[in-house]
From Swiss-Prot:
UniProt main location, coarse: membrane
Annotated disulfide bonds: none
Keyword set, alphabetical order: Cell membrane, Flavoprotein, FMN, Membrane, Oxidoreductase, Pyrimidine biosynthesis
Topology versus the membrane: Peripheral membrane protein
Annotated organism of origin: Azorhizobium caulinodans (strain ATCC 43989 / DSM 5975 / JCM 20966 / LMG 6465 / NBRC 14845 / NCIMB 13405 / ORS 571)
Cofactor note: Binds 1 FMN per subunit.
Binding site for substrate: 64, 109-113, 171, 176, 245-246
GO cellular component, one term: cytoplasm
Gene (UniProt): pyrD
Protein name, as recorded: Dihydroorotate dehydrogenase (quinone)
PANTHER family: DIHYDROOROTATE DEHYDROGENASE (QUINONE), MITOCHONDRIAL (PTHR48109:SF4), DIHYDROOROTATE DEHYDROGENASE (QUINONE), MITOCHONDRIAL-RELATED (PTHR48109)
HAMAP family per UniProt: DHO_dh_type2
Amino acid sequence: MDLYPLVRPFLPLFTPEQAHGLSIRALKKGLVPADRSPADPVLRTRVWNIDFPNPVGLAAGFDKDAEIIDPLLSLGFGFVEAGSVTPRPQPGNPKPRLFRLDEDEGVINRFGFNSQGLAPFIYQLGKRKAAGLPGIVGANVGKNKETEDASEDYVAGVSATCRLADYIVCNVSSPNTPGLRLLQARTEMSALIGAALSARNDSLPDAATRPPLLVKVAPDLDDAGLEAVAEVTLELGVDGIIMGNTTISRPDSLRSRHKGETGGLSGAPLFTLSTERLGALYRLVRGRIPLVGAGGIASGADAYAKIRAGASLVQLYSALVFHGPALVPRIKADLAARLKADGFRSVADAVGADIR
């Protein structure tokens, strides 16, 4: 039974951050029903030699400290990305720092990488690993605000998580840590990602045991910026790119009273921009690097559009705020129906269909 429609009218009684905390506690206590719908074979897909039960994942940000990975997987996600985690604990930016744009089905945040640090994060991942629990889990790593040499923090994050996560993401695109997005420039990204890859490879000399390393970039990159990202990732042998993070732009269509808040905008207002940038990136990499499409997904049609624009996998987060966890099985069912209706036998067959 989907209880979210009964709960949602009471959400305005809490700040968005309080409501998020309540959702984490509810998931910990098993109060959120699991997805019992049968798996549809058309949604199975293989990326980086990993077999995903479906391509619909949870983006980083919901479970920053890897506390509720298994309850989240039980909602029907094909994979869950925990983080962003910083090497040392930090509180992030002052509150309030999270705003619901109800009229727009969007969210603005300026968290600033609030994190308990790597120690509890890898403890949680280690417990899962030791127990042999199923499910595909990514680790999204970032930098502490006060760190001058960003590479040091990404090396620390990659080194600590590479034996415990199924894939790793270097987040260089949050708009809420000063100077972070400058790391997307060609020279800076080449140095940082090169160091991160070396850290992974040094930690795991056997290439067969290494988790894929991805980079998460901003949808605000212009064509020259995208070209730089594509060139650097191809040159270095990065395994994948997530397009994209939140945007600092503000569409004219926004109606919420919170539309002027500083921070990154996510949710429905981000869909058009992030999907266009995804397609532009796909034209540059042409299947040589798998892409993950994120930004504004709230339906099976949205997920399908991302796949047709070049995404091998997709991620969502903000839509859960407005539609609740029952959205996940609805997206999967609709996506499967759309793939079959268009004659695709698999997700992989549809990747980039609108860009070819």
